[in-house]
């Protein structure tokens, strides 16, 4: 399909699970905008600029993917970029109720914005940024869970 979709998150840090969803979305849609969110209620490991750069580096092999930092309402960001839909990853039943509420809210706020749910590949179903941060904070090896650009950035923080 030749239209633009948005995959949004804080990506703190970006994981191989995120990359899996982005790669699959890039095969399905004409353009994928990875919207890297500034969330004032969280204390990020990386700044918005760093997270956006890490997503760009991790997705450099995908010609139809771009990373853009943003703050504010996702529905407004989607309108500004003329996106037809949002892409959301759903790991399991715990995510479904929240994600459906979020999808309905974004649709209502935007006037018309569909949400496409993609389950992660089985390999990454259990993975989250929170888990990666916890492993990292306890000096564990996160190499198998994050793209190389993220791994290098984490090592620089040590």
Swiss-Prot record:
Gene3D superfamilies: HUPs
CDD domains: PPAT
Protein source organism: Actinobacillus pleuropneumoniae serotype 3 (strain JL03)
Binding site for substrate: 10, 42, 74, 88
Protein family (similarity comment): Belongs to the bacterial CoaD family.
Pfam family, one: CTP_transf_like
Cofactor: Mg(2+)
Chain positions recorded as ATP binding sites: 10-11, 18, 89-91, 99, 124-130
Catalytic function, reaction form: (R)-4'-phosphopantetheine + ATP + H(+) = 3'-dephospho-CoA + diphosphate
The EC number(s) this enzyme carries: 2.7.7.3
Name of this chain's protein: Phosphopantetheine adenylyltransferase
InterPro entries: Cyt_trans-like, PPAT, Rossmann-like_a/b/a_fold
Keyword annotations of the record: ATP-binding, Coenzyme A biosynthesis, Cytoplasm, Magnesium, Nucleotide-binding, Nucleotidyltransferase, Transferase
Swiss-Prot/TrEMBL site (Transition state stabilizer) positions: 18
Main location as per UniProt: cytoplasm
Job description of the protein: Reversibly transfers an adenylyl group from ATP to 4'-phosphopantetheine, yielding dephospho-CoA (dPCoA) and pyrophosphate.
GO MF entries: ATP binding; pantetheine-phosphate adenylyltransferase activity
Compartment(s): Cytoplasm
This protein's pathway: Cofactor biosynthesis; coenzyme A biosynthesis; CoA from (R)-pantothenate: step 4/5
The protein's assembly and partners: Homohexamer.
């Amino acid at each position: 399909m030749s239209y633009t979709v948005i995959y949004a998150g804080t990506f703190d840090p970006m994981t191989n699970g995120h990359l899996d969803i982005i790669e699959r979305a890039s095969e399905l849609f004409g353009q994928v905008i990875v919207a890297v969110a500034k969330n004032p209620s969280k204390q990020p490991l990386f700044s918005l600029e760093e997270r956006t750069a890490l997503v760009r580096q991790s997705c450099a092999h995908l010609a139809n993917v771009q990373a853009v930092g943003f703050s504010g309402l996702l529905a407004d960001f989607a309108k500004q970029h003329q996106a037809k839909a949002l892409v959301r990853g759903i790991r399991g039943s715990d995510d479904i109720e929240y994600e459906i509420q979020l999808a309905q809210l974004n649709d209502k706020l935007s006037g018309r914005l569909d949400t496409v749910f993609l389950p992660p590949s089985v390999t990454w179903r259990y993975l989250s940024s929170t888990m990666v941060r916890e492993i990292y904070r306890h000096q564990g090896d996160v190499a198998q869970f994050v793209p190389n650009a993220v791994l290098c950035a984490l090592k620089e923080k040590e």
